[in-house]
C-alpha cells in the first residue's frame, strides 16, 4: 500500500492522487552478475534504497533482448530498443566522431527466453533471508508491465515495495524480503541500518560503485507521490490494511455517475469517469490515534465481527453500559466481546478509518440515519446540488459516490459544479513559502465580500482556474457595484427630498411612458435570463444578464429620466419614474 513513514499510516489511492510532485533524483542502472557466465544483466530502478531487498529481475516476455560486448569490456544483457540509449555514453566524443560503435551484438532473443535465468544476489542479507524462507529467488521473471520507454528493459524486483513487484512476487512465489521498517528506515540486516530510505539512496549508489556493480546513476525526472498531510515522500510498502472492495461495484459506480449532471460535462466523463473506469479497492484503515475507530472486533482464533450499532455492541459485550461508551479511542478499545467460536475475549482492531470515509458518510451520518430521522434523510437525499474544487474528484466526490453506491446503489448528488483553483495574478499556485498567497481576511477587508464574489462570478467559467487580481476586483467593483450603488443613491436622495413612500403607490402600466415600459421589459428579460441560467448552473451567464441590466438602468434609464425626478410636485409621470426605478432596484 502507499505508506507515509512520517505519519506511520497507509494512504488510499485517492489520497495519493492529491500529492504528486515533479522530482529529479538519481536512478540506478546496476550490473547483476549472471550465474555461471561472464556476463551481466543491466537492470534499472528509480528507488536505489530497495536494492538490498532485491530477489528477482523482470523483463517483458514479448520484447527483443540482446547480449552484447560493450566497449567498457563487459558483456551485458538488455533490451534491444534501449541499447543505444544506455550504452552510447560509453563512447568518447572522438570515438563517436570516428564512427565507432558502443557495443557488438552477440546474441538476440525474446524476453521469454530469459525466464528463470539465474544471477548472483546483489546483497548477501537478501540471500540469507530467502534461504530461511525456503524459497527460490534471484532469477529472471516475465511481466508485460515492463516497458521500453525508459531504463534498460530489465527492472529489479522487490515484492515488498510496489504493486507490480508484489504481483510478480506472487506469480513466481518469490521470497518476501522487507529490509525497511515502518519508520522508513533500513533495518540492521543491511549495510545501511537506521538510514531513512531517501537518505540511503546515495549510500547504496556509493556502495555499488565501490563494488563495480553500478553501471550508471542517471538523474531521472518523474512524478512521485507525497503525503498530503506532511508533504513527505511516500513509499510503497507491503503491510496489512483493511479495504473496501470497490472493484466489485465498478459497473454500478460508472452507471450511477452517468446519471449526474457534471458542470463541466468533461469532468464527469473524463477526469472522474476515467478514475472510476480504473477504480482500485479503497484502503480505508489508518494506523493513527485520532479518527473514527474501525468497528471490527477480532479474536486470537481468527474470528472477526463487524459491529453495526450501540445496541449490538452492548448485546455482544454482555454489558448494557457498553451502549453508552464514548465511541473513540481509548474508551472504545476497552470494550471486549465474547467470541462465539472459542469463548475468548475479542478486541477491537487498532486501526481508525480514512477521514475521507467520514466525509462520504455526511449525507446520512448528519441525521444519524438509519437509527432516526429517516424521513428527513429521504427528503434531502440525493443532494440536488454540490460544489467543490477539481481535486475532489479523488476526494469528496469519490467518497460520496462510493458509499452511496454501496449502500443505496444510486448517485448521492444530481448536479455538480466543479471549481478551478484560485491562483495568484501571474497564474501560479498560491503558497505561503513563495510569498504569493493572498490572505482572504485581508482581501475581504480591502475589497469587501460582495466585490470578491462578483469577481469570481464574472471572471470565467467556474471550472477554469482563477487568477486573483486586486485590480480586477476593483474594476468589477467600480463598473458593476459602483454603478448599482450610485443608482440606488440617486433614488434614495430624491425619494427622501420628495418624502416618496413606494408602499403607498402601485405601478399603473397603462400610464407608463415608453422609457418606463422599456426598463420594465429589460427587467423581466433579465429576471427570466438569470433564472434560466441559474437553473442550469450557468453562473457567468447569469452575472452577464445582471451586468447588462444595471448598465441599461443607470446609463440609459436614469440618465434620460433625471428631469422627471427633478420636477416639482408629485405628478403621475414623476410617480411612474419613482415606481419604475424602485421596482427595478428591489427586484
Task: Tell what function each PLM region has.
Residues 172-183, 288-290, 307-308, 313-465:
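Alpha-helical recognition segments enriched in aromatics with Gly/Pro capping
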Residues 1-52, 64, 72, 116-118, ...:
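Residue patterns forming the tRNA-binding/recognition surfaces of aminoacyl-tRNA synthetases
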Residues 2-22, 29, 498-528, 559-587:
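Acidic, turn-prone loop/beta-hairpin segments
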Amino acid at each position: 500500500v502507499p505508506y507515509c513513514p512520517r505519519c506511520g499510516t497507509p494512504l488510499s489511492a485517492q489520497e495519493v492522487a492529491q500529492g504528486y510532485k515533479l522530482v529529479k533524483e538519481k536512478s540506478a542502472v546496476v550490473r547483476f552478475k549472471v550465474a555461471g557466465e561472464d556476463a551481466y544483466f543491466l537492470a534499472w530502478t528509480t528507488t536505489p534504497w530497495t536494492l538490498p531487498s532485491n530477489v528477482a529481475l523482470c523483463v517483458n516476455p514479448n520484447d527483443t533482448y540482446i547480449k552484447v560486448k560493450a566497449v567498457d569490456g563487459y558483456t551485458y544483457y538488455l533490451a534491444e530498443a534501449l541499447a543505444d540509449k544506455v550504452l552510447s555514453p560509453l563512447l568518447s566524443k572522438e570515438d563517436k566522431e570516428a564512427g565507432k560503435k558502443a557495443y557488438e551484438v552477440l546474441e538476440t532473443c525474446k524476453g521469454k527466453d530469459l525466464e528463470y535465468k539465474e544471477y548472483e544476489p546483489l546483497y548477501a542479507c537478501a540471500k540469507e533471508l530467502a534461504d530461511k524462507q525456503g524459497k527460490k529467488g534471484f532469477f529472471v521473471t516475465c511481466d508485460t508491465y515492463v516497458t521500453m520507454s525508459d531504463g534498460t528493459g530489465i527492472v529489479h524486483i522487490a515484492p515488498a515495495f510496489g504493486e507490480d513487484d508484489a504481483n510478480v512476487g506472487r506469480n513466481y512465489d518469490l521470497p518476501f524480503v522487507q529490509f525497511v521498517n515502518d519508520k522508513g528506515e533500513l533495518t540492521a540486516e543491511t549495510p545501511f541500518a537506521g538510514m531513512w530510505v531517501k537518505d540511503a539512496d546515495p549510500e547504496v549508489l556509493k556502495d555499488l560503485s565501490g563494488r563495480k556493480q553500478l553501471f550508471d546513476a542517471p538523474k531521472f525526472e518523474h512524478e512521485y507521490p507525497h503525503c498530503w498531510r506532511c508533504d513527505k515522500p511516500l513509499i510503497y510498502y507491503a503491510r496489512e490494511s483493511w479495504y473496501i472492495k470497490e472493484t466489485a461495484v465498478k459497473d454500478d459506480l460508472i452507471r450511477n455517475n452517468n446519471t449526474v449532471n457534471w458542470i463541466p460535462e468533461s469532468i464527469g466523463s473524463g477526469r472522474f469517469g476515467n478514475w472510476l473506469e480504473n477504480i482500485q479497492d479503497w484502503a480505508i484503515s489508518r494506523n493513527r490515534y485520532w479518527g473514527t475507530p474501525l468497528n471490527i472486533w477480532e479474536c486470537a482464533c481468527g474470528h472477526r465481527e463487524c459491529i453495526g450499532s450501540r445496541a449490538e455492541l452492548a448485546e455482544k459485550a454482555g454489558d448494557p453500559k457498553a451502549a453508552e461508551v464514548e465511541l473513540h479511542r481509548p474508551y472504545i478499545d476497552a470494550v471486549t466481546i465474547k467470541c462465539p467460536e472459542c469463548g475468548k475475549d475479542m478486541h477491537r482492531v487498532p486501526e481508525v478509518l480514512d477521514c475521507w470515509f467520514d466525509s462520504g458518510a455526511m449525507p446520512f451520518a448528519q441525521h444519524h440515519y438509519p437509527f432516526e430521522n429517516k424521513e428527513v434523510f429521504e427528503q434531502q437525499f440525493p443532494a440536488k446540488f454540490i460544489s467543490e474544487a477539481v481535486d475532489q474528484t479523488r476526494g469528496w466526490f469519490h467518497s460520496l459516490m462510493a458509499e452511496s453506491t454501496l449502500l443505496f446503489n444510486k448517485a448521492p448528488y444530481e448536479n455538480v459544479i466543479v471549481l478551478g483553483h484560485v491562483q495568484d495574478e501571474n497564474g501560479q499556485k498560491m503558497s505561503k513559502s513563495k510569498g504569493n498567497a493572498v490572505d482572504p481576511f485581508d482581501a475581504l477587508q480591502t475589497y469587501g465580500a460582495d466585490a470578491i464574489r462578483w469577481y469570481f462570478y464574472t471572471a470565467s467559467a467556474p471550472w477554469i482556474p482563477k487568477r486573483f487580481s486586486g485590480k480586477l476586483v476593483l474594476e468589477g467593483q467600480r463598473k458593476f457595484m459602483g454603478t448599482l450603488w450610485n443608482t440606488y443613491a440617486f433614488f434614495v436622495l430624491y425619494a427622501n427630498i420628495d418624502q416618496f413612500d413606494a408602499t403607498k403607490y402601485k405601478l399603473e402600466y397603462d400610464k407608463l411612458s415608453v422609457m418606463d415600459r422599456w426598463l420594465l421589459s429589460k427587467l423581466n428579460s433579465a429576471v427570466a435570463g438569470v433564472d434560466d441560467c441559474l437553473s442550469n448552473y450557468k453562473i457567468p451567464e447569469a452575472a452577464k444578464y445582471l451586468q447588462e441590466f444595471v448598465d441599461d438602468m443607470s446609463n440609459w434609464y436614469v440618465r434620460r429620466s433625471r428631469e422627471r425626478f427633478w420636477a416639482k410636485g408629485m405628478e403621475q409621470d414623476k410617480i411612474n419614474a419613482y415606481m419604475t426605478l424602485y421596482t427595478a432596484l428591489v427586484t
